[in-house]
UniProtKB/Swiss-Prot annotation:
Its EC number is 6.3.2.9. It comes from Novosphingobium aromaticivorans (strain ATCC 700278 / DSM 12444 / CCUG 56034 / CIP 105152 / NBRC 16084 / F199). One of its GO terms (biological process) is regulation of cell shape. InterPro entries: Mur-like_cat_sf, Mur_ligase_C, Mur_ligase_C_dom_sf, Mur_ligase_cen, MurD. Cell wall formation. Catalyzes the addition of glutamate to the nucleotide precursor UDP-N-acetylmuramoyl-L-alanine (UMA). ATP binds at residues 116-122. It catalyses: UDP-N-acetyl-alpha-D-muramoyl-L-alanine + D-glutamate + ATP = UDP-N-acetyl-alpha-D-muramoyl-L-alanyl-D-glutamate + ADP + phosphate + H(+). The gene is murD. This is UDP-N-acetylmuramoylalanine--D-glutamate ligase.
Amino acid sequence: MIVSRAFAGKRYAVLGLARSGLASVESLLAGGADVTVWDNREEPRSAFEGSCTIADPLSIDLTGFAGVVVSPGVPLNRHPIADHARAAGVPVIGDIELFAQARADLPPHRVVGITGTNGKSTTTMLVHHICAAAGLPARLGGNIGLPILGQEPLPEGGVYVLELSSYQIDLTQSLACDVAALINLSPDHLDRYDGFAGYAASKARLFAMQRADQHAVFGCGDEHTLEIAREASATHDTGFVHVVQPSALHGQLEWPSLQGPHNLQNAAIAVEIARQLGIAEDIWRSALASFVGLPHRMERVAEANGVLFVNDSKATNPASTAPALGAYPRIHWILGGLPKSDNLDECAPYFDHVVAAYTIGEAGPRFAEILEPVMPVTRSEMLCDAVRQAMEAAQPGDVVMLSPACASFDQFRDFEARGDSFRQIVEALIEDREAPCPDGTPT
């Protein structure tokens, strides 16, 4: 694990003992900190009896504490811990801030921080893959993979590649990334912020924490991202702010797991990061070709009778579905779920790529009303029915794509469960077996 002398003799409270919370407690204890822990569940907190004080931070005087460590899932705009800590003059932080404080005790290294509304995980994995191809020791962390504090420190010259959500940035005060990147920005998670401006300000803080001589990389696909790039230009030295033009990157047909305009943007961001890490073009080009995409993100799950089946269950809003529709010319589009938007305006430029649509879930009726004037629509309701109907209609050369433009919680536990169900249904139908069909309630 990552341990630092910076924690020695200090008092911390850790609220929530899930993965990042557990890693934080163990790192703090190993670093010599005095730790108070709490979780609403008895089992995880009982594991620290004898090594930590067991107490709810809301019930104690926090004066003199160095920080209250919470998970990114704690809504700071609603949870009482924020006001309680503020009254005691104590910062509310996350495990990424503890990592930032521990960096001085690590062997010389670099940190890449990647954020954005869509494409974070793919871009982060791609940067990690490129680093590995270049022979650089690298670790994944943040919003992907294992908690960063629970991983072994890298040797000298290593690169920590962090996917950072806005929630994690909110809990971070001193992470000066050697290379920081903002892929894109569109409305999301607005229940946690004072409107879109608050959400954008959260993303912008990643660059405010940098030094003037550290690299800031930006996509060019939306005005909100470009505005943050302009702000960074005022605080960074000349030549350290890079606005990426995906159209300048050629060879996408050679990268099977990076199809579609959104993946061209993800690749362009990753390539610019690689350049700033000093990785040669022949290495990153080879890595783009060998990259295997993440599950549920434009995942090619099967091909049968000339029809390709693509699982893009991670597309939980119209902005992330739109570029998926741009990836193929003839798509049977399965969409719907728990809506984040009552329109599909961002998808409209790619409607001519859609042969037919199949609507499911709570958003199904509304989306059907939007689409019926411009394309054939089947009101399928259930995913298993939609896949079966799309498979029956598809011709050789067509693509059957689940790209829901919605959250999953009306019918599935999460987007992973939805994508897994799609894969299982496709495999069953190809093998001429009865397709599994959930009852329409999340499990």
